């Protein structure tokens, strides 16, 4: 009998159909074709029993197929992965969200006096993107914490807090440390992960599985949008008993159902983005990304992707912070990418973009289809627009981040960078 060892079950899919997950303090002893599991704790000498589980991964999902690399494949899979995270959970006919993984903790979750979302890297950005809708629908304080900083500060956690832990792999060390800290404080914990057998999914009280499938590229793409939707669904589910939010919830649920088809429309921008990267962007090594409200999280995620994949310096800035010496940089003509889709902040964002144009900047504007406000500037060559479909404000960031994923990808391709294995990544390399 052969045994394979791995930190990620996806890498074993081509070799095995069954797996055993080890837990903390487990020691696996393989000898003479047999597996024995012991506990490393002093005084524990008995063998441990761990359940053998079926590995539910399709080999086709961890191959590139017709795509050049995994990152490109995973960007295009977002039409399907956003459907998968909602399948069986979002009912557009009754305007309800059903989350079976949380049902047993319904009473405790709806009694929450504070919600804390804890994550790292891109998962942290998805929490920032979802925070405003939690605050609006739940009407309780909502904190978003970087997992490492959260543990370092020994944050105050109480029994009536609900702590949501978001991780692509479910094995992020800093996030697991934060989870253990919150469990000791007796807070209710929710896991939002892609891997159902992961540490976070096993140790949290309840959770939501994003059903994203394996993400082989180092850069988080489809997991970000799936986490975003999963968090919005949690906010909708937890606020179901608030009568004052019924109409707002209906609006969001109806918008959720058409997000996958709208993503398909956004992906049609790829030829324009390829041309933009080739003619205007690839010679630059500094980028500024502007966003406000829901779109500040989009700016953060876009800047992170450009650093990670394209090896360029990119900075995300709140649009109204332009006056704090940022406009001085704009006159040096670094590419400026501004999120200007329609929401409560549109007039102020338009004013900031006008200031950039006055200083001879040539911003790239991500706006909604049919938004004619920059038509004259576009004809004069002062701006470039990337038009995306319009949706409800709290979901617009899902559509807005995809052009940034494509820009990061094609900048890297133009520079002959291996997008699936970027240098100096803090994450483990996938089995490609």
Swiss-Prot record:
Pfam family, one: SIS
Single GO biological process annotation from the record: UDP-N-acetylglucosamine metabolic process
InterPro entries registered for this protein in UniProt: GlmS/AgaS_SIS (IPR035466), GlmS/FrlB_SIS (IPR035490), SIS_dom (IPR001347), SIS_dom_sf (IPR046348)
Parts forming coiled coils: none
The keyword RNA-binding is assigned to this record: no
A GO molecular-function descriptor: glutamine-fructose-6-phosphate transaminase (isomerizing) activity
Keywords, in A-Z order: Repeat
Entry keyword annotation includes Heme: no
Residue ranges constituting the SIS domain according to the UniProt record: 105-244, 277-422
PANTHER family per record: GLUCOSAMINE--FRUCTOSE-6-PHOSPHATE AMINOTRANSFERASE, ISOMERIZING, GLUTAMINE--FRUCTOSE-6-PHOSPHATE TRANSAMINASE (ISOMERIZING)
Designated name of the protein: Uncharacterized protein EC1118_1M3_2531g
Species this protein is from: Saccharomyces cerevisiae (strain Lalvin EC1118 / Prise de mousse)
């Amino acid at each position: 009998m052969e045994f394979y060892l791995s930190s990620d079950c996806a890498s074993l899919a081509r070799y095995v159909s069954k797996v055993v997950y080890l837990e903390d303090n487990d020691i696996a002893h393989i000898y003479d074709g047999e597996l024995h599991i012991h506990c490393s704790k002093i005084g524990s000498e008995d063998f441990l029993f761990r359940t053998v589980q079926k590995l539910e991964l399709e080999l086709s999902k961890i191959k590139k197929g017709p795509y050049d690399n995994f990152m490109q494949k995973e960007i295009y899979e977002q039409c399907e992965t956003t459907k998968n995270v909602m399948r069986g959970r979002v009912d557009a006919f009754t305007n309800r969200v059903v989350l079976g993984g949380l049902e047993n903790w319904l009473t405790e979750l709806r009694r929450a006096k504070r919600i804390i979302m804890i994550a790292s890297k891109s998962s942290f950005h998805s929490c920032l993107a979802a925070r405003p809708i939690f605050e609006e629908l739940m009407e309780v304080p909502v904190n978003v914490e970087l997992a490492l900083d959260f543990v370092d500060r020994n944050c105050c956690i109480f029994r009536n807090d609900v702590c949501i832990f978001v991780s692509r792999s479910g094995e992020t060390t800093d996030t697991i440390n934060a989870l253990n800290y919150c469990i000791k404080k007796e807070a209710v914990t929710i896991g939002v992960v892609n891997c159902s057998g992961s540490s976070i999914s096993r140790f949290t009280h309840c959770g939501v599985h994003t059903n994203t499938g394996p993400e082989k590229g180092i850069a988080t793409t489809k997991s970000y949008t799936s986490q975003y939707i999963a968090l919005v669904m949690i906010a909708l589910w937890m606020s179901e008993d608030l009568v004052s939010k019924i109409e707002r919830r209906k609006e969001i649920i109806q918008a959720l159902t058409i997000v996958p088809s709208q993503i398909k429309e956004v992906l049609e921008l790829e030829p324009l983005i390829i041309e933009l990267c080739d003619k205007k962007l690839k010679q630059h090594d500094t980028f500024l990304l502007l966003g406000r409200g829901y779109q500040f999280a989009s700016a953060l995620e876009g800047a992170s992707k450009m650093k990670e994949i394209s090896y360029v310096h990119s900075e995300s800035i709140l649009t109204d912070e332009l006056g704090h010496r940022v406009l001085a940089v704009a006159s040096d003509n670094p590419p400026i990418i501004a999120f200007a889709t329609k929401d409560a902040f549109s007039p102020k964002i338009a004013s900031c973009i006008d200031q950039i144009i006055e200083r001879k900047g040539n911003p790239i504007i991500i706006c909604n289809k049919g938004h004619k406000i920059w038509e004259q500037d576009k004809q004069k060559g002062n701006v470039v627009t990337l038009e995306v479909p319009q949706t409800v404000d709290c979901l617009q960031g899902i559509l807005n981040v995809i052009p940034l994923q494509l820009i990061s990808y094609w900048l890297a391709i133009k520079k002959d960078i291996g997008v699936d294995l970027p240098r100096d990544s803090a994450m483990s390399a996938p089995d490609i």
